[in-house]
């Protein structure tokens, strides 16, 4: 067996297990590059639209972005956006958009849609403005927008994007992008909702580290009555691939 990657299926989940974080970053970057190249080629041969790619925040994708920065990717054919964001100034140290820009997109040449933060603008208003930007930028059909690729992560509590356990955002069905309060005293979050994630052509979830192992095991082999938010990504039509390192997969009882 190739020790860099183990490819298995667990129920509806397509799972790719990499030996360590470096192998995960390399493998994820290769998959993302291949996907973007194919979709940009198809788009240019069809209507010339930009390929819509949601970028993940958090710490796990940083190494993947470093790999992507060295690869031959037709970024001029891409419109990137943030799958979720803290509602903070665009240069704030906690901003996902700032991290994504520094790590990759500031020098890549892609169109990059950032959340329209303003000190006097409520988070709900910013979410509505950003949703309008996304709708104008991506393809779709009569049922709604169709993002091409969504990159996401997963927290130790099983959240993905800014869809947290117990959050009202889990039940939103009439918005593609929404504002949600995670905890009192913390910045509001803006996030893609399940209706938008379920419309994607593909979703890649990157998970790294032993601290994520219990949540990943519960997501992929649930034992409780209430599925963790990350599992609900698989309730739609979008194919979801779980790209994980062996430490995160420790609870899956792999051979």
Each language-model region and where it sits:
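ATP/nucleoside-binding phosphotransfer catalytic cores, i.e., glycine-rich phosphate-binding loops
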Residues: 2, 201-255
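A short secondary-structure junction signal
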Residues: 125, 160-166, 215-219, 254
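A glycine- and small-aliphatic-rich helix-loop capping segment at beta-alpha/alpha-beta transitions
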Residues: 66-75, 98-102, 165-174
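N-terminal glycine-/serine-/threonine-rich phosphate-binding loop
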Residues: 1-53
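Glycine-rich beta-strand-to-loop/alpha-helix junction loops that act as flexible
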Residues: 55-60, 152-156, 208
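Ligand-binding beta-strand-loop-alpha-helix segment within the catalytic cores
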Residues: 2-12, 76-151
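Short, conserved loop/helix-junction motifs that constitute active-site signature segments
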Residues: 71-79, 106, 169-170, 195-200, ...
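Class I SAM-dependent methyltransferase SAM-binding "motif I" and its flanking Rossmann-like core
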Residues: 150-195
